[in-house]
């Protein structure tokens, strides 16, 4: 009986409640590290639409030309300055050189449109000679380009949105390059003074619509191999001058190749030997008719690509709202910590869902840093933080909601009358996930091999053991190899596997100045959802009384 009673007592002890002291250890936390947390939301009543007229025009990725017109923003046109520079650091045209032809070629990169029905419209491409080189102060995308008004091409080149851009220069323009001397090649400044380059653009559309055409510009690429080795491959982005000259008393045909817009004079042969690619930067400019839209936003916030209008949130507005709330809660902006801050910019889903491609993929908050010679836009979100919103579009919630936590922390600690407070204004720029593809040459060759094997195997099954064709061409001809090459699906699968290993694609977030964008967000005076600032902040607890 005593054992039974003891067992009951033991079980009761096991299931009994244990008191928990929530304050245990609290006395050991430093008093200056105790905080009260608060959340607040504010309507942003002051948002401006401003043109980003200080974007750099230089691009190392693509040549961009074209024009698009719409009913809201008007005409948005693009043009590109390209300098044609010899691939060698020495030239020899022989005696009495005679011009034959001068050809330009650039592979298609991509296109951008306002209406997908205009992806393949025909556009006339205008090519003019520069009358003077770009100046040292020509940096921004709205720079004035000084060029002639006479075409320098044979006929009128046409872009269709799918093919490479190819044309021939007129003899009057091309033969000028036959006057090139060794002294002209001593540096780029000397060279461009004599051969400043060309300007490419398209005709403006008569009505709404149009297209931006983007073309590649790099002449060399680094190709990696699975073994770890690499080599340099030449692309089809170049110009080539054909001529006839007298060499050692005999007239011969010859040619000179040019590449596009290097930053310095280089001998490409020497770069290939050390497996390096040259730095190339074309000068892409844009023109907008939307500057009349600049001003304080009402019920709509308009966003245009390129250097067109973008939303700007004044730092003074953020400081006024947040600091007033902190003081209201009994805190001091100097000692308050911002745990999280987000700007939400809502939009209405378009009635035609197919037009969502016009909206930026990323609307990134930045600040504008100006000096006497340069203007830089610095991103405010932390790209290395996976849980931080970079400003990606949310099609489900219909908003952009980038995190600006660290920036708001800086803003609230500035004095309200600080003359440099406007330097903390938030400029929203359009970003794009640029993809870079590297090729493994060995895997690509293996993929091509298996593809040919699958091709042959397919026809072997159709034509039997004697291959295909009247003479038994292909693998398995005459029946000798039929048993080994009759499984089309195995070879096709192996080809696809090898092909997947042949290329590696990486993505990086970059400023997008080239593509067309047109977005309408809800403004401060819109009915219903409006732009809002959401903040979570922590105020230090007061010291205990003595």
What are these regions (language model features)?
Residues 4-7, 11-13, 17-546:
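Secreted, disulfide-rich extracellular signaling modules
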């Amino acid at each position: 009986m005593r054992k039974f009673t003891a067992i009951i007592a033991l079980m009761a002890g096991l299931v009994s409640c244990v008191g928990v002291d929530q304050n245990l250890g609290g006395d050991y936390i430093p008093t200056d590290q105790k905080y009260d947390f608060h959340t607040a939301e504010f309507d942003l009543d002051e948002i401006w639409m401003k043109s980003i007229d200080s974007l750099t025009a230089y691009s190392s990725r693509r040549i961009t030309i074209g024009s698009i017109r719409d009913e809201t923003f008007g005409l948005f046109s693009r043009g590109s300055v390209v300098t044609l520079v010899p691939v060698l650091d020495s030239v020899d045209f022989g005696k009495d050189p005679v011009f034959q032809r001068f050809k330009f070629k650039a592979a298609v990169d991509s296109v951008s449109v306002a209406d997908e029905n205009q992806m393949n419209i025909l556009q006339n491409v205008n090519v003019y000679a520069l009358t003077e080189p770009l100046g040292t102060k020509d940096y921004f995308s709205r720079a004035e380009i000084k060029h002639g008004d006479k075409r320098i091409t044979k006929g009128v080149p046409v872009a269709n949105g799918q093919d490479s851009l190819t044309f021939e220069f007129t003899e009057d323009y091309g033969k000028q390059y036959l006057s090139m001397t060794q002294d002209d090649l001593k540096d780029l400044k000397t060279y461009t003074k004599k051969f400043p380059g060309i300007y490419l653009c398209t005709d403006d559309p008569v009505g709404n619509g149009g297209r931006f055409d983007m073309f590649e510009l790099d002449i060399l690429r680094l190709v990696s191999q699975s073994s770890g080795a690499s080599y340099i491959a030449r692309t089809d982005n170049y110009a080539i001058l054909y001529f006839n000259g007298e060499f050692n008393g005999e007239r011969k045909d010859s040619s000179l190749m040019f590449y596009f817009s290097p930053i310095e004079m280089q001998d490409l042969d020497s770069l290939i030997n050390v497996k390096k690619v040259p730095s190339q930067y074309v000068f892409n400019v844009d023109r907008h008719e939307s500057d009349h839209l600049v001003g304080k936003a009402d019920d709509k916030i308009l966003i245009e690509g390129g250097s067109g209008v973008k939303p700007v949130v004044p730092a003074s507005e953020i400081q006024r709202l947040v600091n007033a709330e902190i003081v209201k809660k009994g805190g001091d902006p100097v000692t308050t910590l911002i745990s999280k801050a987000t700007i939400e910019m809502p939009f209405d889903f378009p009635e035609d869902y197919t037009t969502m491609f016009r909206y930026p993929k990323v609307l990134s908050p930045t600040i504008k840093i100006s000096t006497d010679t340069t203007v830089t836009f610095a991103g405010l979100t932390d790209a290395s933080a996976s849980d931080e919103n970079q400003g990606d579009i949310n099609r489900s919630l219909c908003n952009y909601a980038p995190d600006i936590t660290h920036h708001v922390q800086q803003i609230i600690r500035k004095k309200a009358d600080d003359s440099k407070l406007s330097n903390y204004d938030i400029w929203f720029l359009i970003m794009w996930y640029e993809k870079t593809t590297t090729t493994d040459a060995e895997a690509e060759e293996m993929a091509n091999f298996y593809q040919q094997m699958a091709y042959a195997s397919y026809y072997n099954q159709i034509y039997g053991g004697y291959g295909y064709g009247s003479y038994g061409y292909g693998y398995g001809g005459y029946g000798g190899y039929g048993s080994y090459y009759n499984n089309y699906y195995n070879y096709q699968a192996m080809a696809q596997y090898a092909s997947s290993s042949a290329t590696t694609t990486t993505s990086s977030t970059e400023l997008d100045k080239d593509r067309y964008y047109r977005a309408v967000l809800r403004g401060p005076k819109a009915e219903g959802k409006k732009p809002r600032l959401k903040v979570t902040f922590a105020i230090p607890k007061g010291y205990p009384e003595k």
